[in-house]
């Protein structure tokens, strides 16, 4: 196996393992809040952690879940250049969705996906974060805000990258970045299938709802 292939495989493996760290579960257990998988929706992400009533814990989960997506992409850059950033970032999202440590039952990839966007295409990431915040603040439904943000990510990659802005994955290969963001968006949408059904039925829970 040559050096390039070795670096690629290490980036994918490292991204997956980093993404699979269940920070929400770890933090709730360490804080005495219990097993987050038995609280609220059972999801290990920040929105469900917020249902414990501990805002600081939810914020920390959000930052760590986003951080591991960004870290996976940026560490891959040091390993083998920007060409490895997007594959490693996607691997991190997959790791969060299907963590080996939890029987491949993980979160929904929103914070981790946004972390990847911020690391590989910060203008797109910032716009998507702002879009998530605006929608969430307006209608108080986290899932709808997330779906809206990721739906626009591929289009934003084409628009912003087409102007030559952002890090190399965006400025130099905006079509590839758009394709990668489309894949992340598809994964996020698939993991939100139940949420989408509840949104259509008008029964989706709102941000801050206690378990």
UniProtKB/Swiss-Prot annotation:
Entry membrane topology: Multi-pass membrane protein
UniProt keyword annotation of Glycosyltransferase present: no
Pathway: Lipid metabolism; phospholipid metabolism
UniProt keywords, alphabetically: Cell inner membrane, Cell membrane, Lipid biosynthesis, Lipid metabolism, Membrane, Phospholipid biosynthesis, Phospholipid metabolism, Transferase, Transmembrane, Transmembrane helix
InterPro entries xrefs: G3P_acylTferase_PlsY
One MF annotation (Gene Ontology) recorded for this entry: acyl-phosphate glycerol-3-phosphate acyltransferase activity
Record-linked NCBIfam families: glycerol-3-phosphate 1-O-acyltransferase PlsY
Name the record gives this protein: Glycerol-3-phosphate acyltransferase
């Amino acid at each position: 196996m040559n050096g390039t292939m070795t670096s690629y495989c290490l980036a994918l493996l490292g991204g997956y393992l980093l993404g699979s760290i269940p920070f929400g579960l770890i933090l709730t257990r360490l804080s005495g809040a219990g097993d987050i998988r038995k609280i609220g929706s059972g999801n290990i992400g920040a929105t469900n952690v917020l249902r414990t009533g501990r805002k600081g814990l939810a914020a920390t989960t959000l930052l760590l879940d986003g951080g591991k997506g960004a870290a996976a992409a940026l560490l891959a850059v040091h390993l083998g250049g920007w060409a490895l950033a997007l594959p490693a970032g996607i691997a991190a999202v997959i790791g969060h969705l299907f963590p080996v440590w939890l029987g491949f039952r993980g979160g929904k990839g929103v914070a981790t996906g946004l972390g990847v966007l911020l690391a590989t295409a910060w203008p797109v990431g910032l716009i998507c974060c702002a879009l998530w915040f605006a929608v969430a603040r307006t209608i108080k439904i986290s899932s709808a805000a997330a779906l809206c943000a990721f739906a626009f990510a591929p289009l934003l990659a084409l628009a912003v990258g087409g102007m030559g802005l952002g890090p190399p994955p965006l400025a130099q290969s905006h079509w590839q970045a758009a394709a990668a963001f489309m894949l992340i968006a598809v994964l996020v949408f698939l993991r939100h299938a139940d949420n989408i059904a509840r949104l259509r039925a008008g029964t989706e829970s709102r941000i801050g709802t206690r378990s």
